[in-house]
């Protein structure tokens, strides 16, 4: 049981770090024809990044930014609550609070990346038809899966 909790803790930390990276880095869409990429915050072309996104004033990208930041916050809160529950909770109880907080993180990731997918991932306004999703977009979907698994495992596990 201790090994399972330690492994869950390590995966939770890795998920939080991956959420930081996927939110901060500017590689959500990559152009095949040039050294160019677009993120949530900046547009990078030829190694020069500027804060001017072609869709920067749209409400959808602001919603994606907000939900990704909320997912990071809820992931960190869940991690702190888990550590707190690990040392203060009585034996036999479940990690409901940390699990439910992680599932809120999962929901924030789902909403944020779904909005991005609907509005920007397949649009030709970013580059052209020869662009593809970058590693941040893929990393966010991986974090989506990990946060769901972590949240469910927190809800199921009991402290021994």
UniProtKB/Swiss-Prot annotation:
PROSITE patterns, alphabetized: PMP22_1 (PS01221), PMP22_2 (PS01222)
Pfam families (UniProt xref): PMP22_Claudin
Coiled coil: none
Glycosylation site positions: 35, 43, 128
Localization terms from the record: Membrane
Keywords in alphabetical order: Glycoprotein, Membrane, Transmembrane, Transmembrane helix
Topology within the bilayer: Multi-pass membrane protein
Gene Ontology CC entries for this record: plasma membrane
KW Oxidoreductase (keyword) present: no
TM spans (from-to): 1-21, 67-87, 95-115, 137-157
Domain of life: Eukaryota
InterPro entries found in the cross-reference section: EMP_1 (IPR003932), PMP-22/EMP/MP20-like (IPR050579), PMP22/EMP/MP20/Claudin (IPR004031), PMP22_EMP_MP20 (IPR004032)
Record-stated family: Belongs to the PMP-22/EMP/MP20 family.
Name of this chain's protein: Epithelial membrane protein 1
Natural source organism: Mus musculus (Mouse)
Gene, per the UniProt record: Emp1
């Amino acid at each position: 049981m201790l090994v399972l909790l330690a492994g869950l803790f390590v995966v939770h930390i890795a998920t939080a770090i991956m959420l930081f990276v996927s939110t901060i880095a500017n590689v959500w869409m990559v152009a095949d024809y040039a050294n160019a990429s677009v993120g949530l915050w900046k547009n990078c072309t030829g190694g020069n990044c500027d804060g001017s996104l072609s869709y920067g004033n749209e409400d959808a990208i602001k919603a994606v930014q907000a939900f990704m930041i909320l997912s990071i916050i809820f992931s960190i809160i869940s991690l702190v609550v888990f550590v707190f529950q690990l040392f203060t909770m009585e034996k036999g109880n479940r990690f409901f609070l940390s699990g439910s907080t992680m599932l809120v993180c999962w929901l924030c990731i789902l909403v944020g990346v779904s909005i991005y997918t609907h509005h920007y991932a397949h649009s030709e306004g970013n580059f052209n038809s020869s662009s593809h999703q970058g590693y941040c977009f893929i990393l966010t979907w991986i974090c989506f899966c990990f946060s769901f698994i972590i949240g469910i495992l927190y809800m199921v596990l009991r402290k021994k």
